[in-house]
């Protein structure tokens, strides 16, 4: 594809991420984590049908499996979006003003794993709380006042 191109004499371009788009927003992680929280609530609210009602038990199992699968997928996406922010957007200079930044992201990534492994309303809410703090820090670094909100 690049066989006929000449790269001699060109300067090396350096970017802060894999693709230098510069488009970052913790809202992506929030949406995914909010889905995890809502699915956790739905799973906890599911009522197991009475014994002997095979059709209802099958529907219950199907719904439970679907909710768990989607919850795990959304937790992995939240983790991905958090890691992109952590490794591509935030720089060493941000640590001067936010010395707990690495710990916040590390704990958030661990919470993404925890909410995949278990059905914990506490951990799902803790993940949302951490992402809210990341949201606040992120927008402070951009000098913008962007209010936190949730879709549900």
Residue ranges and their predicted role:
Residues 61-68, 86-88:
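Short, mixed-charge, low-aromatic patches
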Residues 72, 95-102:
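Short, well-ordered coil↔helix boundary/capping segments
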Residues 73-83, 137-145:
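Short, charged low-complexity intrinsically disordered segments located at boundaries
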Residues 53, 64-81:
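Alpha-helical segments in soluble extracytoplasmic regions
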Residues 1-65, 99-128, 133, 137-152:
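N-terminal intrinsically disordered, cationic/polar leader segments
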């Amino acid at each position: 594809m690049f066989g006929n191109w000449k790269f001699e004499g060109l300067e090396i371009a350096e970017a802060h991420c894999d693709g230098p788009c510069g488009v970052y927003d913790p809202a992506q992680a929030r949406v995914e984590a909010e889905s995890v929280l809502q699915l956790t609530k739905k799973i906890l609210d599911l009522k197991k049908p009475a014994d002997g009602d095979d059709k209802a038990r099958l529907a219950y199992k199907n719904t439970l499996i679907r909710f768990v699968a989607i919850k795990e997928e959304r937790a992995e996406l939240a983790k991905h979006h958090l890691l992109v922010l952590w490794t591509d957007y935030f720089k060493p200079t941000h640590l001067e003003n936010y010395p707990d930044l690495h710990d916040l992201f590390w704990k958030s990534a661990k919470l993404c794993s925890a909410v995949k492994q278990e059905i914990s309303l506490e951990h799902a809410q803790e993940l949302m709380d951490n992402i809210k703090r990341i949201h606040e820090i992120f927008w402070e670094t951009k000098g913008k006042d962007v209010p936190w909100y949730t879709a549900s």
